[in-house]
UniProtKB/Swiss-Prot annotation:
Function: Involved in mRNA degradation. Catalyzes the phosphorolysis of single-stranded polyribonucleotides processively in the 3'- to 5'-direction.
Cellular component, GO annotation: cytosol
UniProtKB keywords: Cytoplasm, Magnesium, Metal-binding, Nucleotidyltransferase, RNA-binding, Transferase
Protein name: Polyribonucleotide nucleotidyltransferase
Residue ranges constituting the KH domain according to the UniProt record: 563-622
Domain of life: Bacteria
GO biological process, one term: mRNA catabolic process
Residues the record lists as binding Mg(2+): D496, D502
Source organism per UniProt: Trichormus variabilis (strain ATCC 29413 / PCC 7937)
GO molecular function: 3'-5'-RNA exonuclease activity; magnesium ion binding; polyribonucleotide nucleotidyltransferase activity; RNA binding
E.C. numbers: 2.7.7.8
Length: 718
């Protein structure tokens, strides 16, 4: 393909599309640039696999450190395991792209996005999302696009398209909206307790920009002489479906109408019906068309039965406005919660139940040194003081599987719940702890990520973290049949699996802190999105009220097993003195007191120990070391060495001065050793600090009260 370039302008910021320059053997490729940020996105298709019942789409986003002019650390000096941010960006690309591929497509598809250059202004993630659509179009893959994404920021009262990092940091909103010509497909946002109307307006504002990017893609395709591929779906043999409908429809509808059934009971009842069908088919002659259709692949019977069940469940909701558990469309499942369910060795814990979904969250308070360093990120010098980790063991859905490292889903759910809590955390100056919350999904029947938000709030309050406001969350669903639309509150597993939308909304009673919307259809109108957001508010506040009946304010004290933190400020020029050569001084203080010391570049010193007395002792030592000395100050010290003309005394940790032989006594001293020996405790006064910083001490002219006070201060420091 010949090289071609096209530009689109947003508020004076250009997005440049370069086609035919790089990756000529990929199915489709584009270099998408804005400012000095450049992302290469490729799309490649290979022949389909036999016997699979899903679209094998793989999306990989990676960042090369050369993009920021950096060399990786470690022995190998090359990029290693992808950091969490790249996994989240891979998901950000996948989520709006996947629903636009035909449901029948079974070819292997791979989208690879490489950030090859990055400036300090333009985030690469939304460029990668739009680039994925362009690469797919160029690769001539069947695709119900184009699709594009933009970021919306809010600085003051003004919405901004594709804000810079600084504008995102300064604003109250970080929202990514992706859409197709058919409507909005995906929304991802973090917000500072913004009201629903602002979020809806931001989505609308962003979708207008998305439409401009879609038009630019259509123009690009036309200018390249390409056509959007719309392959006809393969013919589907209805033999097996008709057979199952004739024999099982009444039983399926009857089971779906038994609202008293629990999820396991409903699943078991449906399995009995499916097994009876399988038995009947197995008794048919081998050449029977029905048996041939059922044995065409190992999943034919199960998938067909699932599709028929999906049809009747959706019809029941649309026609009767009733769900499989008997709830109204806007009704939340029964909610209960507890705090302090684990012993106080765990700094805080919260148990949240909503229907059959159960999440146990545990909070741990750590020291500043426990913050997560993000040096592998293209944005350097970053760290996280709040961490949320989400675990989804197989027993939570009654399955047996090997336990493995967290996958993309677990990382994504954990990040969403983390984002929901961030706006209500106390400032570092008020609460200097590093905070980690782990949410264990103990039982899953839908909306576990929002259950993790609720569990996190309970655990934080139980741990004594003074959060600004409690946060709750709810997941909304959607059933769309033609023009008929039903928005479902607090979806359970089967509604998530068989529905058209998963829309998670978290926030306080003042506004939204996080939301995430994913579609299984090719787009949704703003009116339906607005309905879901407002319906979610009612659900959130209902759940929040139930949580506040368990604990309405954070505990006033932290666990006795949590570290006690003391924070002081020292002159940054004194940092080297506290650390000492090779860390000798700070290690010595730690060994002597049992306290941990963290020092920041601005001179903030955080001292921690489970025993507060140990922390105070270390604080006193550091304060003594960094105290500004004045002539006339009196200290208790110990003789460290003797020379012919005097004795050296350490009177503060790391600070030493000399007593001249003439200042040892108010009479003539013949030999220093006649008055003091190494290890002796002596009371000294600062006599002089010369222009080289050398400290001259004396034992003369010290009042008994001064000596007593110095001994007392020294005893405290010990």
């Amino acid at each position: 393909m010949a090289e071609f370039e096209k530009s689109i302008s947003f508020d004076g910021r250009d997005i440049r599309l370069k086609v035919g320059l790089l990756a000529p053997q990929a199915g489709g490729s584009v270099l998408i640039e804005s400012g000095d940020t450049a992302v290469l996105v490729t799309a490649t298709r290979s022949a389909g696999r036999e016997g699979i019942d899903f679209l094998p789409l793989t999306v990989d986003y990676e960042e090369r450190l050369y993009a920021a002019g950096r060399i990786p650390g470690g022995i190998m000096r090359r990029e290693g395991r992808p950091p969490e941010k790249t996994i989240l960006t891979s998901r950000l690309i996948d989520r709006p792209l996947r629903p636009l591929f035909p449901s029948w497509l079974r070819d292997d598809l791979q989208i690879v996005a490489l950030t090859m250059s990055m400036d300090e202004q333009v985030p690469p993630d939304v460029l990668a999302v739009t680039g994925a659509s362009i690469a797919t179009l160029i690769a001539k893959i069947p695709f119900n696009g184009p699709m594009a994404a933009v970021r919306v920021g809010l600085v003051g009262d003004d919405f901004i398209i594709n804000p810079t990092y600084a504008e995102i940091e300064a604003g109250d909103l970080d929202l990514v909206v992706a859409g197709s010509p058919h409507g909005v497909i995906m929304v991802e946002a973090g917000a500072n307790q913004l009201p629903e109307r602002d979020i809806i307006e931001a989505i609308d504002f962003g979708y207008e920009a998305v439409r401009d990017l879609i038009k630019a893609q259509l123009d690009l395709v036309a200018e390249l002489g390409l056509e959007i591929v719309q392959e006809a779906p393969p013919e589907v043999d209805q033999t097996l479906e008709n057979y199952i409908r004739d024999r099982a429809s009444d039983e399926i509808k009857k089971i779906l109408a038994q609202f008293e059934l629990t999820k396991p009971e409903r699943d078991a009842a449906l399995d009995v019906v499916k097994d009876n069908i399988a038995t009947a088919i197995a008794e048919l002659p081998e050449e029977d068309p029905i048996r041939l259709a059922a044995t065409a692949n190992s999943k034919a019977l199960g998938n067909t039965f699932k599709d028929i069940t999906k049809y009747f469940m959706r019809r029941q909701i649309v026609e009767d406005n009733v769900r499989v558990d008997g709830r109204k469309l806007d009704q939340v499942r029964p909610v209960s919660s507890q705090v302090g369910v684990l012993p106080k060795r765990v700094h805080g814990s919260g148990l949240f139940n909503r229907g059959l979904t159960q999440v146990l969250s545990a909070c741990t308070l750590g020291t500043p040194g426990d913050a997560q360093n993000l040096n592998d990120d293209l944005q350097t010098d970053q760290s996280k003081r709040y961490l949320h980790h989400y675990n989804f063991p197989p027993f939570s859905v009654g399955e047996t599987k090997p336990l493995r490292a967290p996958g993309r889903r677990e990382i994504g759910h954990g990040a969403l719940a983390e984002r929901a809590i961030l706006p209500v955390l106390p400032p570092k100056e008020q609460f200097p702890y590093v905070i980690r919350v782990v949410s264990e999904v103990l039982s899953s029947n839908g909306s576990t990520s929002m259950g993790s938000v609720c569990g996190s709030t309970l655990a934080l309050m139980d741990a004594g973290v003074p959060i600004l406001k409690p946060v709750s969350g709810a997941a909304m669903g959607l059933i769309k049949e033609g023009d008929e639309v039903r928005v479902l509150t607090d979806i359970q597993g089967i509604e998530d699996f068989l529905g058209d939308m998963d829309f998670k909304v978290a926030g306080t009673d003042a506004g939204i802190t996080a939301l995430q919307m994913d579609m299984k259809i090719s787009g949704l109108s703003l009116e339906v999105i607005a309905q879901a957001i407002h319906q979610a508010k009612d659900a959130r506040l209902h759940i929040l009220d139930k949580m506040l009946q368990t604990i309405d304010t954070p505990r006033t004290e932290t666990s006795p097993y949590a570290p006690r933190l003391l924070t002081i400020k020292i002159d940054p020029d004194m940092i080297g003195l506290v650390i000492g050569p090779g860390g000798k001084t700070i290690k010595g203080i730690t060994e002597e007191t049992g306290a941990k010391i963290d020092i920041e570049d601005d001179g903030t010193v955080t001292i921690s120990a489970v025993d507060e007395n140990k922390a105070k002792r270390a604080r006193n030592i550091v304060q003594g070391m960094t105290r500004k000395l004045n002539e006339g100050d009196v200290y208790a010290g110990r003789v460290t060495r003797i020379i012919p003309i005097g004795a050296f005394v350490e009177f503060l940790p790391g600070k030493e001065g000399m007593i001249h032989i003439s200042q040892l006594a108010d009479y003539r001293v013949g030999k220093v050793e006649d008055e003091v020996a190494v290890g002796d405790e002596v009371i000294v006064k600062v006599r002089e600090i010369d222009n080289k910083g050398r400290i001259n001490l004396t034992r003369l002219g010290i009042h008994p009260d001064q000596a007593a006070a110095a001994r007392e201060a020294a005893a405290v420091n010990r």
